[in-house]
């Protein structure tokens, strides 16, 4: 196990973290950290600590990192370039106050798959995504392999991707707040696959926040239509979207004028 100690990297910056009254500190490593490929660490796992932030790094293999002691990410990967197109990750802890596990990520491949395994997660936190190398193109696949207990701003400010595919089971989620919060996203598509909201008791209706125009949202799974109908009937944020809800092979599209779901076709 590799432990990253003080002064082992070129620069270490300490600054107070005050979000939500949290006055603890986090480390910021900048410049020269290249995933161990040039410092002889490439054969061992790199241990990450709670609150650590890696900035401006080239990440060749995210699976080489040990997240076992990380409880709050705090923009853990800030403006990092990711070179592989497949990751099988496992996070443990409460990520609600992270400010983003990945912040301004830059993918070197146009089509990236992230398999994100949730274990003991109360809140997933956020991906702040910017595909700087391939703007407005590519597809991000994110699979949540365990049930989400509390969803809070999972994806935010998705400038870079033409399509986001999110696979997950939200049937036991006790609350929703801004699962997607985006700006500058005209012409994009997000696909919610198996978006099962389960029992509506104690559910927060603010599922999406700051929604820009021309998103196509495809919802599949067992989501109660009534929940999304209330969202769409708001009339200020949702009914400019092309909503599609899939139930089995039936494909239902919400008519914002008639304010009702219309059977629009069948999936193969």
Locate predicted features.
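C-terminal capping region of solenoid repeat domains
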Residues: 235-268
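Leucine-rich repeat
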Residues: 130-132
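Small/polar residue-rich beta-strand/coil "junction" motifs that cap repeat-based extracellular fibers
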Residues: 76, 154, 206-209, 231, ...
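Consensus positions within tandem repeat domains that build extended binding/scaffold surfaces
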Residues: 74-76, 99-101, 125-128, 152-154, ...
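Intrinsic-disorder/low-complexity detector
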Residues: 1-47
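Structural signature of tandem-repeat unit edges
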Residues: 15, 38, 42-71, 78-97, ...
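Flexible coil/linker segments and helix-coil junctions enriched in charged and small residues
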Residues: 22, 26, 190, 235-237
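A generic structural signal for ordered secondary structure
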Residues: 28, 32, 40, 103, ...
């Amino acid at each position: 196990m590799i432990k990253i100690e003080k002064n082992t990297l070129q620069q270490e910056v300490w600054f107070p973290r005050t979000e939500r009254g949290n006055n603890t500190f986090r480390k910021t490593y900048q410049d020269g950290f290249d995933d161990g490929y040039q410092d002889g660490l490439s054969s061992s796992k790199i241990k990450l600590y709670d609150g650590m932030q890696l900035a401006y790094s080239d990440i060749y293999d995210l699976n080489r990192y040990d997240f076992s002691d990380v409880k709050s990410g705090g923009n853990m990967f800030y403006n990092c370039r990711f070179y592989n197109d497949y990751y099988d990750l496992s996070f443990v802890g409460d990520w609600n106050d992270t400010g983003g596990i990945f912040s301004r990520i830059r993918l070197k491949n146009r089509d990236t798959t992230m398999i994100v395994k949730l274990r003991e997660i109360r809140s997933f936190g956020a991906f702040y995504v910017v595909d700087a190398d391939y703007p407005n193109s590519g597809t991000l696949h994110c699979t949540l392999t365990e049930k989400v207990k509390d969803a809070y701003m999972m994806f935010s400010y998705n400038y870079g991707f033409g399509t986001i595919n999110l696979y997950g089971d939200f049937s036991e989620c006790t609350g929703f707040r801004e699962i997607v919060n985006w700006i500058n996203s005209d012409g994009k598509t997000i696909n919610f696959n198996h978006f099962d909201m389960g029992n509506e008791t104690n559910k927060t209706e603010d599922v999406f926040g700051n929604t820009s125009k021309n998103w196509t949202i495809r919802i599949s799974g067992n989501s109660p239509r009534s929940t999304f109908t209330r969202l769409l009937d708001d009339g200020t944020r949702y009914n400019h979207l092309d909503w599609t809800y899939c139930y089995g092979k039936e494909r239902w599209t919400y008519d914002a004028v008639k304010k009702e779901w219309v059977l629009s076709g069948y999936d193969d």
